[in-house]
Amino acid sequence: MDKFTVLTAIAAPLPVANVDTDKIIPARFLKTIKRTGLGTHLFDAMRYIDGQENPDFVLNREPYRQAQILVTHENFGCGSSREHAPWALLDFGIRCVIAPDFADIFYNNSFKNGILPIRLPRDICDRLMDDAGNGANSRLTVDLERQVVVRPNGEEIPFEIDPFRRHLLLNGLDDIGQTLQRREAIDRFEENRTVTQPWFPRITLPAN
């Protein structure tokens, strides 16, 4: 998983509340277990009309085709649980979503997949959305190390994040990465276990 430290990027405004996971990535695209290729179908129902790009949808317009930050409204990621939702966002290039609040499962899945979900009050999200609407001047900076969002005018907006989740993103650690951090202890345990319980096969962790 890629580290998240400081991100300065185009922010796309999506002024829609209650964007559920089926709007993020429709169920018909969930047959794959690959994390790549899903970005093409991100927001499929809003992004395409009869198989053609909807020119009015924000991610179909420049400079937002290169957006890495999404600013939206309440209850983002609600609906059914599907890890494909953060996969689709990440495959498109989105590394940070800013909203007043998120559905819990989507919020948790985002961290596990290297996406930073930031909760900020609605009035601040509206200000950031106004910033994001300025086309080529819509760049925001998200500084996870200092826990601030920096607007184009230089104003710094602080945000809260669980310290452990912050540590994981800063160091690019997913569940497997966390396990591999303890590989020496795991290897010692396995060596001892082959002596005390030789009937169990030894587990060998993959090389870094």
UniProtKB/Swiss-Prot annotation:
- According to the UniProt entry, what is the EC number of this protein? 4.2.1.33
Residue span of the signal peptide, if any?
none
Is Amino-acid biosynthesis set as a keyword in this record? yes
InterPro entries in the record: 3-IsopropMal_deHydase_ssu (IPR004431), Aconitase/3IPM_dehydase_swvl (IPR015928), AconitaseA/IPMdHydase_ssu_swvl (IPR000573), IPMI_Swivel (IPR033940), LeuD (IPR050075)
Domain of life of the native organism = Bacteria
Query: Which GO CC annotations does the UniProt entry carry?
Result: 3-isopropylmalate dehydratase complex
Name its pathway. Answer: Amino-acid biosynthesis; L-leucine biosynthesis; L-leucine from 3-methyl-2-oxobutanoate: step 2/4
EC main class here is: lyase
Q: In its keyword annotation, does this UniProt entry include Flavoprotein?
A: no
Note the Pfam families from the entry.
Aconitase_C (PF00694)
Q: Which reaction does it catalyse?
A: (2R,3S)-3-isopropylmalate = (2S)-2-isopropylmalate
Choose any GO biological process term that the UniProt entry carries and state it.
L-leucine biosynthetic process
Q: Which UniProt keywords apply?
A: Amino-acid biosynthesis, Branched-chain amino acid biosynthesis, Leucine biosynthesis, Lyase
Q: Name one GO molecular function term.
A: 3-isopropylmalate dehydratase activity
Family (UniProt) = Belongs to the LeuD family. LeuD type 1 subfamily.
Looking up NCBIfam families in the UniProt record yields: leuD, PRK01641.1
Q: How does it assemble?
A: Heterodimer of LeuC and LeuD.
Function recorded in the entry:
Catalyzes the isomerization between 2-isopropylmalate and 3-isopropylmalate, via the formation of 2-isopropylmaleate.
Q: What is this protein called?
A: 3-isopropylmalate dehydratase small subunit
Q: Which organism is it from?
A: Granulibacter bethesdensis (strain ATCC BAA-1260 / CGDNIH1)
